[in-house]
Amino acid sequence: MAQLKQILQEMGSVIIAFSGGVDSAFLFKVASDVLGAAALGVTARSPAVPRNDLRDVEAFVKQFALNHEFIETQEVKSRQYRCNPTDRCYFCKEELFSRLHQLRKERGIAHLVDGSNAEDVGDYRPGARAARRQGVRSPLQEAGLTKDDIRALSRELGLPTWNKPAAACLASRFPYGTPISAEKLRKIDRCEDRLRQLGVRQVRLRHHDTIARIELLPEDFEIVLRHRDEITDFLKKEGYTYITLDLQGFRSGSLNLSLIHISEPTRPY
């Protein structure tokens, strides 16, 4: 923690790309403690961001009276993003970081930072390339903090995010190569929101054309089975023909499994 505070102190002023997740929430709170109003958290609003995540962001900011703003991002207007290639995240993060970089210059803020931690090297992360391109710094990574470290320190600080489940944008519900649209993203958001209303804690509704594949924690299977007819009716009204429950349960990044032996594509960025 001391090293992180020193890094932030030396930065002087920062914009934090704040998603509301464990890492960026911890970074935002510590940066605010160290820098006061010179720490500005900024959250993107777009069809790809779950409404549930935005509600969590608003609650966190209100609880700790933090300096925060929302911005609208337009990644869904990008043809490259909508085509949903394996490096889709690059185009999303490029849009986000370029807008934050412009805001940073307009406000005279010294640095743009994100919540990447010391372990963020395992999954497929083309978005990290966009961060490097835009000169984004990662104080948690620089301080050598792991996810477990961040959860433990968040708990010590009394942050409600200390045990928050992993989250991902709604575009991650589509297999690579399946075209994405704003309406498809909103449909996934509505479906997942409905499942959460029934008491499901962690959910991914994977979109396979006319098939909805629901990933849940195994201990929540019973909830879905109990409300089977209600869920089936709702999802069919949303356009799905077949409603399935994945017996392997919730797996973060499950649609990346086909990429395990694929190296990142090289692009002249």
Predicted features and spans:
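ATP-dependent adenylation/nucleotidyltransferase module used to activate substrates
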Residues: 1-156, 197, 212, 230-240, ...
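Internal, active-site/partner-interface "lid" segment
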Residues: 164-182
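Short amphipathic alpha-helix segments
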Residues: 182-201
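Short, aliphatic-rich beta-strand segments
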Residues: 207-217
